[in-house]
Amino acid sequence: MSLLVVGSLAVDTIETPFDKRERALGGSATYISLAASYFAHGSDIGLVGVVGEDFPEHAWKLFQGKGFDTSGVEVIKGGKTFFWAGKYHYDMNTRDTLTTDLNVFADFKPKVPAKHTSPDYLVLGNIAPSLQLDVINQMKKKPKLIICDTMNFWITGAKDDLMKTLAKVNALVINDGEARLLVDHPSLVVCGHKLQEMLAPDNHRIVIIKKGEHGALLFYDQFIFSAPAYPLEEIFDPTGAGDSFMGGLIGYLTRWETIQYATVKRAVVYGTVLASYCCSKFSTEAIENLSMDQIYRRFRELQSISSFEDEPFRTQKHDSAAGTM
Amino acid sequence: MSLLVVGSLAVDTIETPFDKRERALGGSATYISLAASYFAHGSDIGLVGVVGEDFPEHAWKLFQGKGFDTSGVEVIKGGKTFFWAGKYHYDMNTRDTLTTDLNVFADFKPKVPAKHTSPDYLVLGNIAPSLQLDVINQMKKKPKLIICDTMNFWITGAKDDLMKTLAKVNALVINDGEARLLVDHPSLVVCGHKLQEMLAPDNHRIVIIKKGEHGALLFYDQFIFSAPAYPLEEIFDPTGAGDSFMGGLIGYLTRWETIQYATVKRAVVYGTVLASYCCSKFSTEAIENLSMDQIYRRFRELQSISSFEDEPFRTQKHDSAAGTM
């Protein structure tokens, strides 16, 4: 199954309470494609984005090693790659942005190469909703699933565009604060259902609300699935965790001909696994060379920490008197 | 199995964005015992607390109807019952305390009646840690399990007392903010393990961190269990939800001769069920007359929303090459 990933390719300078890394590899498309590569064949993954001539050599080598098709990545002569610098606070849940230099990303107009205009799965990383819509309009064939991300900046600044994009999308991945901002309701359950109503009506409507250390909620048609977080003792660098989640999720889905609830639930759990690994080293370091053993081990751990047995005293018949359970 | 509940018995005036209730029944011991009564026989539940002559007649009738032994509830002649008034904000997660009149609770010295000094299970609701310790010292026989609650007020104002109490306790129920305050670490996983170290060393060490809408984390010896929250669309009145959780949890445990991990996991889920019902009406109204059917239905729903199937392509042997999962 082919997978097209559209998003940012960036250079990040990251400071945490423990360490600092200058000009590391970053960007939503980077994390998404790397995380997806554990499930999809590298050669089935196409990237669309823009970089400057300073995009790190090791990143090109990494993409090449994975077999990604980077023909959709525009390299701007004399241009500089999108640069972000941020500093995480002690609790790792909040961060200050120190620098955002859009550089070549400021004029990004995604051009999907002809050979990528009919992917099975389309992932729209967090870019302007109008650009996400533009990419959808470049599709020659309707993908099995279009999944997108967004952020506060677009919810408050480009809501009309965002609503138009969501109406063409089958799955939305969003964090809890963004969900509440977009729906304007305190209950995440209500938010999830209202967000589903914003999506394309001609397919399953899938909403995934990421809650960081509290796991994720999946809304799939009328079903709700509550996924646990992987119980990490320490977070080294949370940059890209949300994108790794999305990549693990969509990567896993590309293994399947059809979208089914049981499969999407597992995909959310694999997304959780990739996000957990992402946090354990700087930048993309932890998700560059995982083994499937490492991934499956955490999948099983998540199953173990969230499962409980049914009531042994119960039979099919429900007793209604207290004391007879 | 006998259960002794020590805590506050109160009268609450509660205002939410939707409605208001004057002088409703409240108090930690009230919610705990009512929630526990669905699993334990009423006559096995003893209450220790203090009230004034104004304690509502319908509360006495309710306790009597459940069969609770209230011989440990002191009625102070001419005294007034602990009174709390609060107002919830729009998001229902935050509230302002408008009035706290300790009244007879100010001089509360728990006196455990002789017949209750060897309960199988002892629950210490949120009162001063020195009083919790005093109750433990009144025990003639070591209970199978001593479980306690606490709050910010004691963590900051009576930490030494609290640590002495915890060292005699087998299980602690605490919310996420309190856990971080007591341990001073941002990771709840680290907090859970550090809190376990504070508990009595001669038994299972059980810590339950309540995360409200995000569910709960159970730390049981070296195991972690992540329990989902019940997906409520609307919260009517969250007062007493934490105590109802504790009551459902301990009530369920009294059905068992021994403390086992699988049982404690289910107990956490039943606690979640009782807390979810508690939020659906004012005060104790929703947990006064539940059927076991209603309780078990939500237990099964929680099992359904949190379960996912193992990877169908996997066998016992872990493949380590990507693409062969």
Where are these regions (language model features)?
Chain A
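Conserved phosphate-binding/catalytic region of the ribokinase-like
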Residues: 189-325
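Conserved N-terminal subdomain of the carbohydrate kinase-like
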Residues: 11-23, 40-123, 137-142, 295-325
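Short, conserved phosphate/pyrophosphate- and ester-handling motifs at nucleotide-, phospho-/glycolipid
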Residues: 36, 175, 242
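Short catalytic helix/loop segments, enriched in acidic residues and glycine
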Residues: 19-35
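Conserved phosphate/ATP/ADP-binding segment of small-molecule kinases
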Residues: 137-145, 152-226
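Alpha-helix C-terminal capping segments
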Residues: 34-44, 252-254
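Short beta-strand scaffold segments in enzyme catalytic cores
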Residues: 34, 83-87, 215-219
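Extreme N-terminal starter segment of soluble prokaryotic enzymes
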Residues: 1-4
